[in-house]
């Protein structure tokens, strides 16, 4: 079932005729707006409720132009009315309905997200690069009651939704109307809901350890994520961020979209990542200026490659460095480990030391290097305000599992157990941003937490020299070889310093004698050759003997997902099928 709606600046209404939903054009009228401000911002509210504070400011800039906060709010309210017309009133349900949506990287995403929340429903963002089978899985697993899709995606989503009996609301960008022409009069008021514990968003994990799980966050979880980052990274309404990431992960949704919209700042969003366009924004060449940039390490590597190829003259390079230092106040890297050679080269090029931080779908951001002050390469800093972290070792017992705590801290400091300094262990997190549950997976949710309420991240970490270090996923990045524990991420950081290696993934290959052996999968620079013996000789100067790769696999490309992550379990199955 497909129902016409609006995208950008067009609107259609719908009504029931003989059991079918039909599309009817709304007449154009002049219009006055009465936007009532939220009663209080001291309680938990969704980000859309802040829009009236910044009514005429530019909220977003996309390929269609500029969009004010009032523009986004009015368009969202109109779409919300259509969602309510189709679903009844989701806000009246004890368990809100789920609404899955798929939009391009432009203002339509915000309009749809806000509209779902205005309706009292739970937003389930879909990934445009996922194959139909994965999209169908999310629709089915989330038990979505409605699919909202921009018209270019309906050919993919409509057949899937029809198989599952889910109606589809189509967003169309064919018209070019001003918001004042959308409705005769619209009065926007604060929904009378208790937002705090209400479900807000389900984001599906990348599924590197099995089928993706739906991570349900409440409005309080999102509020906590956003306000912590806004305060810690100094967001103001004068900021402007360049957005080039997908919009189905916390990094792209919360850090790069909700944070600027919370404070009245501007989000300049690109349809897709393009190195040339990003450099144009950095240098202010006939494009909107920006002063914040966040990305994954893979993107920084591609920006460096573009720089090396196109900015060859010394005067140009001096200009690039000066422009980046003058125009940009903050550059952040996350979602996967940042290779130190990339950090160092980026610092040489732009004068910026990338701010590394640590987070995941289930917890938002937990650790960050300081906005001001020294940033330790390879480390992820200290807990954000409101977040508690600890590193522990499990002590299995008949009656359950107890933990020995090595280090535990919050934003005010970290306490280290005597005799357990610099000891690695599982990183566990507690705080208001930690998710509510895995959708419809009670046992998985229960197993994800300790008996005293700490979320088990599955990452191995260490507190050392006043900062936290992530050593990798316990399941795939900690290689147990001959009694030693080897961090695959540490080995990767070293190998990326080799002049012939441009990309690398280190895995633990099965070994009858040692349990596991260190295997390096590498992409070499064009025209370069490298043997295992040559790599071993080079590595002896920079790595402990037990960390040196025992196997070298050369590939043309190392597969990564949109967030730059490598599925190492798939690599193990591919190269070691038995």
From Swiss-Prot:
Gene designation: acsf3
Q: What does this protein do?
A: Catalyzes the initial reaction in intramitochondrial fatty acid synthesis, by activating malonate and methylmalonate, but not acetate, into their respective CoA thioester. May have some preference toward very-long-chain substrates.
- Please state which protein family the record places this protein in: Belongs to the ATP-dependent AMP-binding enzyme family.
SUPFAM superfamilies in alphabetical order: Acetyl-CoA synthetase-like
Q: Mind telling me what this protein is named?
A: Malonate--CoA ligase ACSF3, mitochondrial
* One GO cellular component term noted in the UniProt record for this chain: mitochondrion
Q: Which GO terms describe its biological process?
A: fatty acid metabolic process
Query: Which top-rank group of organisms is this from?
Result: Eukaryota
Q: What range is the organelle transit peptide?
A: 1-19
Which species expresses this protein natively? Xenopus laevis
Query: Where is it chiefly localized?
Result: mitochondrion
Checking Pfam families in the record gives:
AMP-binding (PF00501), AMP-binding_C (PF13193)
What reaction does this enzyme carry out catalytically? tetracosanoate + ATP + CoA = tetracosanoyl-CoA + AMP + diphosphate; malonate + ATP + CoA = malonyl-CoA + AMP + diphosphate
Which keywords has UniProt assigned to this entry?
ATP-binding, Fatty acid metabolism, Ligase, Lipid metabolism, Mitochondrion, Nucleotide-binding, Transit peptide
The record's GO molecular-function terms, alphabetically, read:
ATP binding; malonyl-CoA synthetase activity; medium-chain fatty acid-CoA ligase activity
User: Which EC class does it fall in?
Assistant: ligase
Localization: Mitochondrion
The EC number(s) this enzyme carries: 6.2.1.76
**Disordered: region residues:** 394-413
**InterPro entries linked:** AMP-bd_C, AMP-bd_C_sf, AMP-binding_CS, AMP-dep_synth/lig_dom, ANL_N_sf
Q: Which residues cross the membrane?
A: none
Residues holding ATP: 205-213, 459, 473, 565
Keyword Cell cycle applies:
no
């Amino acid at each position: 079932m497909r129902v016409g709606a609006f995208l950008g600046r067009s609107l259609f209404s719908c009504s029931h005729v003989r059991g079918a939903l039909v599309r009817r054009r709304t007449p154009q009228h002049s219009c006055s707006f009465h936007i009532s401000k939220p009663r209080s911002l001291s309680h938990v509210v969704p980000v859309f409720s802040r829009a009236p504070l910044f009514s005429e400011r530019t909220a977003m800039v996309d390929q269609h132009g500029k969009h004010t906060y009032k523009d986004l709010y009015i368009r969202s309210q109109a779409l919300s009315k259509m969602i309510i017309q189709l679903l009844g009133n989701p806000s009246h349900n004890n368990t809100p309905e789920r609404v899955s949506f798929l939009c391009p990287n432009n203002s339509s995403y915000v309009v749809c997200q806000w509209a779902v929340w205005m309706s009292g429903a739970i937003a389930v963002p879909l990934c445009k690069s996922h194959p139909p089978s994965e999209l169908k899985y999310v629709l089915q697993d989330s038990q979505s009651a409605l699919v909202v899709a921009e018209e270019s995606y309906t050919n993919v989503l409509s057949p899937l939704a029809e198989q599952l009996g889910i109606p589809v609301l189509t967003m169309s960008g064919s018209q070019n109307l001003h918001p004042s022409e959308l409705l005769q009069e619209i009065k926007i008021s604060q929904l009378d809901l208790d937002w705090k514990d209400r479900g807000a968003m389900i984001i599906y994990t990348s599924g590197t350890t099995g089928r993706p799980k739906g991570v349900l966050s409440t409005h309080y979880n999102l509020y906590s994520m956003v306000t912590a980052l806004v305060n810690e990274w100094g967001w103001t309404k004068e900021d402007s961020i360049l957005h080039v990431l997908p919009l189905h992960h916390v990094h792209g949704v919360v850090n790069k979209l909700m944070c600027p919209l919370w404070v009245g700042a501007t989000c300049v969003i690109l349809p897709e990542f393009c190195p040339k366009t990003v450099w144009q924004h950095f240098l202010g060449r006939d494009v909107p200026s920006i002063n914040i940039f966040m990305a994954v390490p893979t993107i920084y590597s591609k920006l460096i490659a573009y720089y090396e190829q196109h900015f060859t003259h010394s005067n140009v390079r001096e200009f690039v460095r000066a422009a980046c230092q003058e125009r940009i106040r903050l550059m952040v890297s996350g979602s996967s480990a940042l290779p130190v050679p990339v950090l160092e080269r980026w610092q040489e090029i732009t004068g910026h030391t990338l701010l590394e931080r640590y987070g995941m779908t289930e917890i938002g951001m937990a650790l960050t290097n300081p906005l001001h002050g020294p940033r330790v390469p390879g480390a992820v800093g200290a807990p954000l305000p409101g977040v508690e972290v600890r590193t522990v070792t499990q002590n299995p017992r008949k009656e359950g599992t107890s933990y020995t705590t090595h280090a535990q801290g919050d934003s005010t400091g970290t306490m280290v157990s005597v005799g357990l300094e610099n000891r690695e262990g599982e990183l566990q997190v507690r705080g208001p941003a930690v998710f509510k549950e895995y959708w419809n997976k009670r046992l998985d949710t229960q197993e994800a937490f300790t008996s005293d309420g700490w979320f088990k991240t599955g990452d191995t970490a260490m507190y050392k020299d006043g900062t936290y270090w992530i050593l990798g996923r316990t399941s795939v990045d900690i290689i147990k070889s001959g009694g030693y524990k080897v961090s695959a991420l540490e080995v990767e950081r070293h190998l990326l310093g080799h002049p012939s290696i441009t990309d690398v993934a280190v895995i633990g290959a099965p070994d009858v004698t040692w349990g596991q052996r260190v295997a390096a999968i590498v992409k070499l620079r064009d025209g370069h050759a490298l043997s295992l013996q040559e790599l071993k000789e080079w590595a002896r100067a920079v790595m402990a003997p037990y960390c040196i790769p025992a196997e070298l696999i050369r590939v043309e490309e190392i597969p990564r997902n949109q967030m730059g992550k490598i599925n190492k379990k798939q690599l193990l199955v591919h190269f070691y099928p038995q």
